[in-house]
Amino acid sequence: MAEISDLDRQIEQLLRCELIKESEVKALCAKAREILVEESNVQRVDSPVTVCGDIHGQFYDLKELFRVGGDVPETNYLFMGDFVDRGFYSVETFLLLLALKVRYPDRITLIRGNHESRQITQVYGFYDECLRKYGSVTVWRYCTEIFDYLSLSAIIDGKIFCVHGGLSPSIQTLDQIRTIDRKQEVPHDGPMCDLLWSDPEDTTGWGVSPRGAGYLFGSDVVAQFNAANDIDMICRAHQLVMEGYKWHFNETVLTVWSAPNYCYRCGNVAAILELDEHLQKDFIIFEAAPQETRGIPSKKPVADYFL
């Protein structure tokens, strides 16, 4: 069981916010790929489970999330993407989540967000961070290859559909999602792009997204989708909400946001959603990790796109 003890040591190291060696990243990504390649585009997840939104490289706040929500493997987690970019510790954040996935594959589910993309990470921080911390782009390459293997969505007990962004005019059924070839860079348009980029909007039908990708979708679209697929609700992330979570359309869509004091300046709280075995909901609200627990690195300029 040398592999397990190696993994446990790497997890311990990453929990201390210490980097693992480039050769270890390569091996970790190879193991992760073997696990992720078996997962469906609509990955089945059993309750009880704790559902989390965007993390964005806020490593010490991810540790705070585990402090309030429980550690893996005692708690079963589903993370809805956007592990990287904007925060100071995208490398440590993503590698920790990946190491936990390899160590406890049935206790943590990772699905893809719009930032799990080569193009986006070259603009919003992860690429530069890999270069700065490892001295080359090799680690970024290993990680972005893994992004292509991440599932596009999950379904909890057949009743709660979880996706990073939202719905697509090209998709009416979960089976249509299952047929997408996901092992690629996030396209600029089309169903795979929409799942990762779309947002709910207080309207009916479909609207043009101000993000330049995906769509705005209304309450009638959600009602049709939920009925067609016999699901109770859609759970998604992708949008900052100051209270940590927000209901839309008469509690048929839920936004969960898990990066407190986003970008170290927004002043928002974060939330995670605990679902018990009967899918009863309990929200845990938490604030940013206290200052004394973090080593804040020198502030680096980031592109000021703020969505």
Curated annotation (Swiss-Prot):
GO molecular function: metal ion binding; protein serine/threonine phosphatase activity
Binding site for Mn(2+) 1: D54, H56, D82
Binding site for Mn(2+) 2: D82, N114, H164, H238
Residues annotated with Leucine methyl ester modification: L307
Post-translational changes noted in the entry: Methylation at the C-terminal Leu-307 is critical for interactions with regulatory subunits and functions in DNA repair.
Residues bearing the modification N-acetylalanine: A2
GO terms under biological process: regulation of double-strand break repair via homologous recombination
InterPro entries: Calcineurin-like_PHP_ApaH, Metallo-depent_PP-like, PPA2-like, Ser/Thr-sp_prot-phosphatase
Domain of life: Eukaryota
EC number of the protein: 3.1.3.16
Cofactor: Mn(2+)
Location in the cell: Cytoplasm; Nucleus; Cytoplasm, Cytoskeleton, Microtubule organizing center, Centrosome
Pfam families: Metallophos
Cofactor detail note: Binds 2 manganese ions per subunit.
Reactions that this protein is recorded to catalyse: O-phospho-L-seryl-[protein] + H2O = L-seryl-[protein] + phosphate; O-phospho-L-threonyl-[protein] + H2O = L-threonyl-[protein] + phosphate
Alphabetical UniProt keywords: Acetylation, Cytoplasm, Cytoskeleton, Hydrolase, Manganese, Metal-binding, Methylation, Nucleus, Protein phosphatase
Active site, renumbered: H115
GO (cellular component) term, any one: nucleus
Catalytic EC class: hydrolase
Quaternary structure and partners: Serine/threonine-protein phosphatase 4 (PP4) occurs in different assemblies of the catalytic and one or more regulatory subunits. Component of the PP4 complexes PPP4C-PPP4R1, PPP4C-PPP4R2, PPP4C-PPP4R2-PPP4R3A, PPP4C-PPP4R2-PPP4R3B and PPP4C-PPP4R4. The PPP4C-PPP4R2 complex appears to be a tetramer composed of 2 molecules of PPP4C and 2 molecules of PPP4R2. Interacts with REL, NFKB1/p50 and RELA. Interacts with SMN1 and GEMIN4. Interacts with IRS4 (phosphorylated). Interacts with SMEK1/PPP4R3A; the interaction requires PP4R2. Interacts with HDAC3.
Described function: Protein phosphatase that is involved in many processes such as microtubule organization at centrosomes, maturation of spliceosomal snRNPs, apoptosis, DNA repair, tumor necrosis factor (TNF)-alpha signaling, activation of c-Jun N-terminal kinase MAPK8, regulation of histone acetylation, DNA damage checkpoint signaling, NF-kappa-B activation and cell migration. The PPP4C-PPP4R1 PP4 complex may play a role in dephosphorylation and regulation of HDAC3.
Family affiliation: Belongs to the PPP phosphatase family. PP-4 (PP-X) subfamily.
Name of the protein: Serine/threonine-protein phosphatase 4 catalytic subunit
Organism ancestry: Eukaryota, Metazoa, Chordata, Craniata, Vertebrata
Gene (name only): PPP4C
